[in-house]
Amino acid sequence: MKYKVITTFKPGDWDRYAKRMVQSVLDRWPKADITVYCEGQRPNFNDQRVTWWDIDKANTGLLKFREDYRNDPVAVGKLDEIPGGIRRSSRLETEGGLDAKKESYLWNAVKFSYKVSCVTHAVRTYTDYDYVIWIDDDTYTFRDIPMQFIESICPNDTLVTYLDRENDRGSNKYPECGLVCYNIKHKLVQNFINDWEKLYTSADIFELLEWHDSYVFWHLTKEYRQKHSA
């Protein structure tokens, strides 16, 4: 099986933990092949198994989204509203949790759009691979990963594989998205990332109850289960 690992990190986090994450994948994953998306100047890290991409060039539609909304406090998780600006969903009055009236990353749509830039670019670009595997940059692989395990979480007939924790207890209603596997050969995978991207470029994301990566991903996977039995 041929797989591509992808990740990104915010400025200042390379030496903090992202470098350690990348090196651990190179050391512990079999036949590791990584693309790292970064902002600004790339770090001084040379390995032929690592490809670098400027994240702002990865998806111009999502770059425009960030440029349009990065100065709107509500779109970056704040409470201060500006005339004609974004507003949180009115559904929070009845469906919101303890953070509904607080500043929180749960509504930082701009921040989490960076991850979507990476995934959409990778799924569209690396079509000669079997799977694209997203791994958060603050993780660490501490033991060797057998290829058999990777194959077990990347089956031929599954659209996406993720860490499911859906239940009725607080924030655990939506997935943990620190590791997500995208089946490049699945007939719906391009539609999936197109729909994900469109939530941002159409600004429909702001109609959702929350705007962070796990909630938006959860929203999309539920739609695909209902419409496509995926």
Give residue spans per PLM region:
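Short beta-strand-to-loop element that shapes/binds the nucleotide-sugar donor at the catalytic cleft/hinge
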Residues: E151-S152, N156-C181
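Catalytic core and acceptor-binding pocket of nucleotide-sugar-dependent glycosyltransferases
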Residues: L179-A230
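N-terminal anchoring/stem segment of glycosyltransferases
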Residues: M1-K101, R124-Y129, I184
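Residues that flank catalytic or metal-binding motifs in active/ligand-binding sites
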Residues: K115, I135, P175-G178, D213
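Short catalytic/ligand-binding loop motif for oxyanion handling, primarily in non-cytosolic enzymes
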Residues: P43-F45, G61, T141-D144, F149-I150, ...
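A structural signal for well-ordered alpha-helical segments within the folded catalytic domains
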Residues: R16-K19, S113-S117, W211-H219
